[in-house]
Each structure stands twice: as C-alpha cells, then as structure tokens.
Amino acid sequence: MILEHKQMIYTIIIGFFITLILGPLIIPFLKKLKVGQTVREEGPRSHLQKTGTPTIGGLIIIASVLVTSFTAGLINQDLWVAIGAMVAFGLIGFIDDFIKVVLKRSLGLRAYQKMSLQIIVAVFLAIYQSNISVMGTKIIVPFVKGSLTLGSFTIPQYLDLGILYIPFIVFVVVATVNSVNLTDGLDGLASGVTLIVAAFFSILAMEWGYPSLAIFAAAVTGSCLGFLRFNSHPAQVFMGDTGSLALGGAISAVAILMNVALIVPIVGGIYFAEALSVILQVISFKLTGKRIFKMSPLHHHYELSGWAETKVVIVFWIVTVILCLIGMLGLN
C-alpha cells in the first residue's frame, strides 16, 4: 500500500506539472483564435472585466489527464471507460464552445441537442456497468452497514435497483455533468471544488482496490490543481463547457464504476446546491413572479450580497472538504 500511495502522489504531481507545461502552450493559441468569453450583462458588474478572457481551457485539463493516466502504467478496462466518459462529455462541451466562441453563434448547441448527447453517453456507461460489474444493478447506500430498518421499511447496504438501474444512473450522470457546468462561474471555483472531490475518489478507490481508477482520479486532481495556476482570480483562461462537462463526466464515471453513485450528491454537494438554486429560482419566478435568490446560480447570489469573488470560492472549497470528510465516514 505504501508503494501504491506513493504512485498516487506521483500521479498528482505529474498531472500538476504537465498542466503547468501545457498552459503556456495552449493559452496563447486560444488568444490568437480570439475565443474570448462573453459575460452576462445582467451579472455582477465586476465580471465585465472578464470579457474576452480565453475559454475552451478545458483542453488543457483533458490533455493533462490523458497523458498522466497513461504514464502511470495501470491501464485496464475501467480506466478506458473513465477516460472515454471524460473525453465524450468533453467533446460535447467542445462542440458547444466552438459554436459559441469560434462560429460566433451565441446559443451554441440547443438544449435538446446537448441533453440528447449527454443521455446517449450516460446510457452507454450505465449499460456497461450493469453488465460488467459483479454487483450488477446494485449500488452501495452510504451510512448503511448491513441494513437499516426504519419502521417497517428496511434499507439494505447493497440496494438492487433492477430495471430502474439504467434510468437512475443516467439521471445521476447527466445531473452531475450539468451541475459541474453551472458551478463553473467564478475564477477557480469548479476546478478547485473538483480537485477536492477527485482527491476523495482517488483515496477511496485506492482503499477499495481500484488502482486504475485511483490513478485516474489522482490525474484529475493534479490537473485541476495545475489549472488553478491559470484559472484562479484573476483568471488567464476559463475551462469552458469543454472542461466543466469533461470534469463532470470524469467524476460521475468513477462513482458509477465503483458503485457509489449515491455518494456524489454528498461529496459534490456544492455542484448540486448550484443546480438546485437555478431550479428553485426558475420555479419561484414562474409561479410567483418573485426570485428566491438575488441571482442564480448560488455563487452569484453571494457575490451580489457583498461577498468578494475569492471569498465565495474559498468558502465553497472549505464546504467541499467537509462534505468529502462526511462522505468518507459514510463509506467506511
């Protein structure tokens, strides 16, 4: 285990430095292409200065994760599936970014197109896992050892979803991917939160005997850590949908392959709080004509409440650390 933990640490370090190397090579290229970010005029006024900052920086993260994962030498089917999910979702995001910032069509992919593509990838992932995993259509329920009885209702530690497995997994994957996308609204927020969540899965995978997934998650951790060098405030580059969808795909794939889909809303609580704030805002406005938050997603609400952008980011990082510690308790 000592050697394995060292290898995981080496992977994080390698991912970090590969990102540091790729950044200065790719960012100037993105600037030449003039793939600048468009900032919402109704958003916080401080964000207007971000207009023109290169986006599609997620290519840096994806490239770093690929190189780092393969250099570790622990290549198996799980690794290929995790990488496939990350690249597939990253490609969907890239197409969306390309249409918006290169072809200058502000809408990008239409909502139904983006959702359809995401569902297709998620279905493949769900079918693969249900057929390959020894657990079949079972998932692990956090905080339950053996079984938990609540009155006349018993919750098993290994919950068999049966025919509901595939739609459930598709929902988790698509929800995670889009929640990460909504989280990517402040400098360093999505990359910082994701490096913490990825580190959680790397440690868990190592302890549970999934070495290739541990290496993959460690590669994501190191790559996100390196990306913060360019994405922390004031950001030199944004990851765009290319990066946020890829990271959402990576996190959800590792969780699905380890049969711990139910832990994602816990450790990724920030992701889902961001998504929930948008849903509640829309529902409230349509039903009552009033808004619950000053602005959604949630991070903008805190900005408009007087918090500095960096404070929001750091607080959300801290919350994620706490949530990951709670997640560890729920699975050990």
Curated annotation (Swiss-Prot):
- List the HAMAP family: MraY (MF_00038)
Q: According to the entry, what is the taxonomic lineage of the organism?
A: Bacteria, Bacillati, Bacillota, Clostridia, Peptostreptococcales
Q: What does this protein do?
A: Catalyzes the initial step of the lipid cycle reactions in the biosynthesis of the cell wall peptidoglycan: transfers peptidoglycan precursor phospho-MurNAc-pentapeptide from UDP-MurNAc-pentapeptide onto the lipid carrier undecaprenyl phosphate, yielding undecaprenyl-pyrophosphoryl-MurNAc-pentapeptide, known as lipid I.
Tell me the domain of life. Answer: Bacteria
Please provide the record's keywords in A-Z order. Answer: Cell cycle, Cell division, Cell membrane, Cell shape, Cell wall biogenesis/degradation, Magnesium, Membrane, Metal-binding, Peptidoglycan synthesis, Transferase, Transmembrane, Transmembrane helix
Q: What is its EC number?
A: 2.7.8.13
Give the bilayer topology: Multi-pass membrane protein
A molecular function (GO) term: UDP-N-acetylmuramoyl-L-alanyl-D-glutamyl-meso-2,6-diaminopimelyl-D-alanyl-D-alanine:undecaprenyl-phosphate transferase activity
CDD domains according to UniProt: GT_MraY
Report the sequence similarity comment from the record: Belongs to the glycosyltransferase 4 family. MraY subfamily.
| Major enzyme class | transferase
User: Where does the protein end up?
Assistant: Cell membrane
Q: What is this protein called?
A: Phospho-N-acetylmuramoyl-pentapeptide-transferase
In terms of one coarse class, where is the protein primarily found? membrane
Q: Which Pfam families match?
A: Glycos_transf_4
* Reactions listed under catalytic activity: UDP-N-acetyl-alpha-D-muramoyl-L-alanyl-gamma-D-glutamyl-meso-2,6-diaminopimeloyl-D-alanyl-D-alanine + di-trans,octa-cis-undecaprenyl phosphate = di-trans,octa-cis-undecaprenyl diphospho-N-acetyl-alpha-D-muramoyl-L-alanyl-D-glutamyl-meso-2,6-diaminopimeloyl-D-alanyl-D-alanine + UMP
